[in-house]
């Protein structure tokens, strides 16, 4: 990993489980039937250079697990979300759009960032409401493997 930072967009199993539990225990009926949702896509990888930007969107998809089709939330249609590779020292911009039915943020776990880009709801950032977007300015001073995940 020679001087590169891999910000892994693997919405780790715990996050996927959190999404699934949240969606499956909600008291209100689903707004869209599972059958009408797009199928979860294969995770893609993207390499960003210093100064580049990336569009990231959260929205519901369907995925079949052990023969049962369930509604899950995905980043850019995939579970886990996109793998984002960034060189150490690079500064990138992530334009996030919340196309879900819940308020959320993105937390770049373990990355040293300004509070305004940390994604901790009602502490460092307001929740991003359904249909709204937020632009994250991220810098990567440290080499490492990181992941990003939602906060509700």
Question: Locations of the language-model features?
Answer:
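N-terminal, post-signal-peptide metal-ligating segments of extracellular/periplasmic oxidoreductases
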Residues: 2-135
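Hydrophobic or amphipathic alpha-helical targeting/insertion segments
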Residues: 11, 132-152
């Amino acid at each position: 990993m020679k001087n590169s930072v891999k910000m892994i967009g693997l919405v780790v199993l715990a996050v996927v489980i959190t999404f699934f539990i949240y969606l499956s225990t909600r008291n209100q009926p689903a707004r869209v039937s599972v059958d009408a949702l797009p199928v979860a896509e294969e995770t893609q990888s993207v390499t960003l250079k210093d100064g580049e930007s990336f569009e990231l969107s959260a929205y519901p998809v369907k995925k079949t697990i052990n023969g049962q089709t369930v509604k899950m939330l995905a980043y850019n249609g995939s579970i886990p979300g996109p793998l984002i590779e960034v060189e150490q020292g690079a500064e990138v911009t992530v334009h996030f759009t919340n196309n879900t039915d819940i308020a959320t943020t993105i937390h770049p776990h373990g990355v040293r960032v300004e509070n305004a880009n940390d994604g901790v709801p009602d502490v460092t950032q307001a929740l991003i409401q359904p249909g709204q977007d937020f632009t994250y300015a991220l810098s990567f001073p440290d080499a490492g493997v990181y992941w990003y995940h939602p906060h509700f």
